[in-house]
Structure formats: structure tokens, C-alpha cells
């Protein structure tokens, strides 16, 4: 297991794009220490910020967190990364495979553009978790994003495929959603599914619902029971939510209107 131990408070935001087990596996500790990660004129390197210990394995642990650690696990294609603490924005951006775990909380845009693998945030996530960054065509695009705490506004904005689990979420969850599944065990904020084209949003409760969502009854759908079984190892609270009778709403009828929102009946 390779480790990066944070030396202290960060003087600026740092960009950890491509700081992955695969990228570090062919480098010596001295070579890794020269990798540029700064975002200002200071020219910070990996060695300036972290004490580095490499063993060539496919497992990397970052000891110590900071809200200034941006793009942790971005472009991860194999192996695992574990962060003991908080991280900044764009956690796991463009991740293709592997496992990425944060023991603290994450900033905005966690999981944006991630096509595979599993991202687990044991704390809270900022706005636009699983959402699209500016000018991007899609947010989460096939990966699994698990948020054990609360997610901010616009959870899953322009999500294209994959799955998001969360404890609760703010306003505009599943906004502009293209496809995929979001299960929130607790409450949603106002206007869930704004501009939703397709996809499935399941929640314990919701705030103000858009007038462009219409109730379609309480169907007994096989896929909901199958989804509950598949979620048991990822989120017990989310799986439990699916075991009861759910009321279905269809929308957003102001767009394509093939999305669906389920809440307990």
C-alpha cells in the first residue's frame, strides 16, 4: 500500500489529476515528488505537499484531508484510493474503474463524468454531486456514487447513467436527468426532477413538486424489488425504502417526460 501523508495546511488549491496508483507505480519516490500539482505561480509539487511512501501496489492511501484537495481520483482506471479526511471539488472526475473512498466530506461536482467504479463518501457532498460541470454533456455516466450523508442542490444534474445513493439531498435533485437511478433514503428539497427527461428518482419525501409531474398510481413493479435486493450491500436504508408501497409520479412533462419519481405511499 502506497501512502501520501499531508504535511500540513495547504497554501493553495492543489490538483491531484492523474495522481493514481497506476501513475505512481512506475516512479521512484523522488520522481513522484517532482510531479506538479499546484494551481498558482508557487509551482507546488507532490513532494512539497505530501510525505511520499510508494510500494508499487494498486492501493493508495492519502492520510490527512483538506477541502483544497481537488480532483482526487480523477481518471482512476484501476486499483483503489482512500482519503482519510475531506476533499475538494471534482472527486473522481472521469473515473473509469476501481474504488475511491473518502472518510470525510467532498466538495461540489463529486463523480462528474465518472463512467465506472465505485465512489463512496462517508460524510456529505457539495452541490452538483454526480452532476455535469460547465459545458459538459453529462454528469455521472455509469459509475456508482454512494453518499452516506447529505448531498447539496442539483444532485445528479444531467446524469446519464449509473447509480447514486444518498442520505438526503437539496433542491433540484435529478435536474435535467438523462438516465440512471437515484435513491435518497431521506428528504429531497424543492423541485426534484426539474427538466428531467428519463431516469428514476426514489426518495423518502420531497419538497414542493413541479406542476409538470403527474401522479400515476402505486404500481407493483418487479424492477423495484430487484433494485432493493441489489442495494442491500451498498445502502441498507435505501434498500429498506424500496420494500414498501411507492407512489409514482411521471415527468418532467415540460420536456420529454419519461422520468419517474417514487415516494412512499
From Swiss-Prot:
Major localization listed first in the record, in broad terms: cytoplasm
Matching Pfam families: GXGXG (PF01493)
GO terms of molecular function: formylmethanofuran dehydrogenase activity; transition metal ion binding
GO cellular component: cytoplasm
InterPro entries from the UniProt entry: Formylmethanofuran_DH_suC, Glu_synth_asu_C, Glu_synth_asu_C_sf
Domain of life where this protein originates: Bacteria
Alphabetical UniProt keywords: Cytoplasm, One-carbon metabolism
GO annotation, biological process: formaldehyde catabolic process; methanogenesis; one-carbon metabolic process
UniProt-annotated location(s): Cytoplasm
Pathway entry: One-carbon metabolism; formaldehyde degradation; formate from formaldehyde (H(4)MPT route): step 4/5
SUPFAM superfamilies, alphabetized: Alpha subunit of glutamate synthase, C-terminal domain
Record's function text: Involved in the transformation of 5-formyl tetrahydromethanopterin (5-formyl-H(4)MPT) to methanofuran (MFR) and formate via the formylmethanofuran (formyl-MFR).
NCBIfam families recorded: one_C_dehyd_C
Similarity remark: Belongs to the FwdC/FmdC family.
Miscellaneous comment: Although FhcB and FhcC do not possess a formylMFR dehydrogenase (Fmd) activity and have an unknown function, they are required for the stability of the complex.
Subunit structure: Octaheteromer. Part of the formyltransferase/hydrolase complex fhc; composed of FhcA, FhcB, FhcC and FhcD.
PANTHER family, alphabetized: TUNGSTEN FORMYLMETHANOFURAN DEHYDROGENASE, SUBUNIT C (FWDC), TUNGSTEN-CONTAINING FORMYLMETHANOFURAN DEHYDROGENASE 2 SUBUNIT C
Protein name: Formyltransferase/hydrolase complex Fhc subunit C
Amino acid at each position: 500500500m502506497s501512502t501520501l501523508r499531508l504535511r500540513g495546511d495547504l497554501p493553495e488549491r492543489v490538483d491531484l489529476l492523474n495522481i493514481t496508483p497506476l501513475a505512481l507505480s512506475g516512479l521512484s519516490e523522488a520522481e513522484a515528488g517532482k510531479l506538479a500539482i499546484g494551481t498558482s505561480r508557487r509551482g507546488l509539487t507532490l513532494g512539497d505537499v505530501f510525505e511520499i511512501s510508494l510500494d508499487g501496489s494498486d492501493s493508495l492511501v492519502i492520510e490527512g484531508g483538506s477541502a483544497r484537495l481537488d480532483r482526487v481520483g480523477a481518471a482512476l482506471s484501476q486499483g483503489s484510493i482512500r482519503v482519510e479526511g475531506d476533499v475538494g471539488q471534482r472527486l473522481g472526475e472521469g473515473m473509469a474503474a476501481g474504488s475511491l473512498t473518502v472518510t470525510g466530506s467532498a466538495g461540489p461536482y463529486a463523480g462528474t463524468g465518472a463512467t465506472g467504479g465505485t465512489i463512496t463518501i462517508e460524510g456529505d457532498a457539495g452541490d452538483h454531486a454526480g452532476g455535469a460541470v460547465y459545458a459538459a454533456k453529462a454528469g455521472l455516466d455509469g459509475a456508482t456514487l454512494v453518499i452516506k450523508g447529505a448531498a447539496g442542490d442539483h444532485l445528479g444534474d444531467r446524469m446519464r447513467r449509473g447509480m447514486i445513493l444518498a442520505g438526503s439531498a437539496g433542491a433540484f435533485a435529478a435536474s435535467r436527468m438523462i438516465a440512471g437511478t437515484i435513491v435518497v433514503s431521506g428528504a429531497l428539497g424543492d423541485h426534484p426532477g426539474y427538466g428531467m427527461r428519463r431516469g428514476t428518482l426514489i426518495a423518502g419525501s420531497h419538497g414542493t413538486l413541479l406542476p409538470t409531474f403527474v401522479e400515476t398510481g402505486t404500481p407493483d413493479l418487479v424492477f423495484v424489488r430487484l433494485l432493493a435486493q441489489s442495494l442491500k450491500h451498498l445502502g441498507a436504508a435505501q434498500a429498506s425504502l424500496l420494500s414498501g408501497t411507492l407512489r409514482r409520479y411521471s415527468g418532467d412533462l415540460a420536456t420529454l417526460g419519461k422520468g419517474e419519481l417514487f415516494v412512499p405511499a
